[in-house]
């Protein structure tokens, strides 16, 4: 047909691609599914986590005589809040079983919380990662870091003299060496949809496939992250213009790399660092 379609959880031999475990898959694909309806995934300390819990019951019988337990834990697996809800869900329906209104604690450092849902005595469960940030931004920019938005002779002189430079380029100035940010992975086949969009004179998707990074890098000391894209990156990705780094050595890896599609296969970077003479340069082409 149209070419390679990089979709699906199983490969052509019905083997797991390793994208997700069977246990995690069943959290959202089973005869009973527990759902937390939340307006967002990122919160500030002292904010209220509000939402509701719903249960879909597609077993052969009414779901009754059981309790659903929800638990909010921090990154040390300490319980922040917890509650039990009795269930009475008719067969073939989904229903709201209770509200969520949790007062989040004040925190000094960003942290990942987890909201877990489970029905006692069963294997039915689900979980949602949440990112909690200090209510007030206490980040102090070190005096030895020079923040610039425009590349000029002064920036070159700073690096030549051994300074540290943090550069936020204006993407409009570098349109020929950037692509636009895309949070979700590109769908199906980049070449096919690119040609269709061009034919009907519609914007072409950036065509990228998410982020790749090392969570232990010092730049993430106050920003919890996985090695891959997750919801705390949404706003930054939508306001990013990853740089095309094809001219750099094969073994160079940006701090935050953007994975390109197999058709185009650029090396793309959203955050990258370089030694420039005796100086150090950190380039961030997204709005932090």
Language model feature labels by segment:
Residues 143-191, 278:
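Short alpha-beta junction capping motif
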Residues 1, 166-169, 283-284:
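A structural signal for short, well-ordered beta-strand segments and their strand-loop junctions
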Residues 39-41, 84-90, 103-105:
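Beta-strand-rich interaction surfaces with strong enrichment in secreted/lumenal proteins
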Residues 86-90, 123-139:
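Short beta-strand elements
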